[in-house]
């Protein structure tokens, strides 16, 4: 009996010594979302993988994963603060050379860029006297797109604007877009006469202009707020949703569009000119969604800087949709100056006013 106890104690001391030497260097962790981008409230999966590359079984491994604030995990009543990360705790028994994969269903209710930043693992010694802690860092992200605004009030407004600028293009003739020539009837203005073609034909010929050119618009999103104007969080978020809604409307009408904004995209040190080239199609639209999802309400320029950007990058768009949280003297002046400077129709859309109109319509 004494020999058995000595052997048992010796064996326990050896296991305790080995467990104390375990510093988790053989434990690898990876956590990834199954989608790069989602709609607000859309369910996606978070896949966590734990791999033990060592030759020792770890009977007790407590894992605290760092998830973004606002994350809702299906089946778990978590009231997480939108602004703070929260810890999702689980306990594992992991054998040597074993990989454990766990999948959870989750969703995020608000637009933004969310990070899965790693985990903290805690393991105990063999006798359960001590705990060891190690932090594993990573940075996987998921982008939540701005919400699509499906209000009839907004759709009617966009339809009216579309009808307006699509008709206006017929009022001005572009001398570059000549599709063909025809005989002069006497009703055409003198500037329509092609003297070169007339000389070839020995009678007057006039130019016919091509009006089937692609329409193009600029979505100009201004999120600049002076510190004295307050936060206006709801109105700012509404601007992002308006930009997404306009882009989707233009996709349906097969109108090329681009986005210009003074908002920071992603990290505060990353200034973006957004989707600054006009285009359309699924790839262009998806790029715009990710841009809007990552954008913050922090700005790199004032209203005046935004005006300079638009004038510099103007390329003959038929219309400019100017989006801002609310109207003020500075913004009204910007709209007037753009209207006078550029050969485009400028449509101001102020979130505060539209929110009021939507509520009244409902």
Predicted region positions:
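Exposed, interaction-prone extracellular/peripheral surfaces
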Residues: 186-362
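Membrane-targeting alpha-helical segments
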Residues: 1-8
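An amphipathic, basic-hydrophobic helix/alpha-beta surface used to engage anionic
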Residues: 11-269
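Generic structural signal for short, solvent-exposed loop/turn connectors between secondary structure elements
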Residues: 1, 158-159, 166, 353-362
């Amino acid at each position: 009996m004494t020999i058995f106890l000595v052997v048992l104690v010796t064996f326990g001391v050896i296991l305790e010594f080995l467990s104390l030497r375990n510093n988790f260097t053989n434990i690898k962790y990876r956590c990834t979302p199954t989608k790069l981008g989602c709609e607000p409230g859309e369910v996606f999966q978070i896949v966590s993988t734990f791999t033990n590359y060592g030759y020792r079984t770890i009977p007790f491994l407590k894992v605290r994963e760092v998830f973004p604030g606002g994350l809702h995990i299906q089946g778990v009543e978590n009231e997480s603060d939108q602004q703070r990360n929260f810890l999702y705790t689980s306990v594992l028994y992991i054998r040597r050379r074993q990989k454990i994969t766990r999948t959870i269903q989750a969703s995020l209710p608000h637009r933004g860029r969310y990070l899965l930043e790693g985990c903290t693992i805690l393991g105990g010694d063999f006798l359960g006297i001590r705990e060891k802690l190690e932090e594993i860092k990573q940075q996987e992200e998921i982008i939540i797109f701005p919400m699509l605004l499906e209000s009839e009030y907004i759709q009617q407004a966009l339809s009216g604007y579309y009808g307006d600028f699509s008709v206006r293009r017929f009022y001005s003739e572009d001398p570059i877009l000549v599709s063909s020539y025809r005989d002069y009837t006497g009703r055409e203005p003198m500037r329509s006469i092609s003297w070169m073609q007339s000389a070839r034909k020995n009678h007057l010929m006039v130019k016919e202009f091509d009006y089937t050119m692609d329409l193009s618009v600029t979505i100009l999103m201004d999120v600049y707020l002076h510190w004295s104007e307050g936060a206006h969080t709801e109105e700012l978020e509404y601007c992002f949703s308006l930009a997404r809604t306009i882009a989707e409307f233009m996709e349906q009408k097969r109108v090329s569009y681009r986005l210009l904004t003074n908002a920071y995209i992603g990290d505060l040190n990353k200034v973006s000119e957004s989707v600054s080239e006009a285009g359309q199609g699924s790839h262009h639209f998806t790029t715009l969604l990710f841009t809007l999802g990552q954008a913050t309400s922090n700005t790199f320029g004032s209203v005046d800087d935004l005006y300079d950007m638009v004038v510099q990058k103007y390329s003959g768009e038929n219309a400019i949709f100017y989006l801002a949280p609310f109207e003020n003297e500075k913004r009204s002046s910007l709209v007037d100056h753009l209207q006078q400077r550029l050969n485009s129709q400028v449509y101001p859309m102020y979130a505060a006013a539209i929110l009021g109109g939507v509520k009244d319509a409902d």
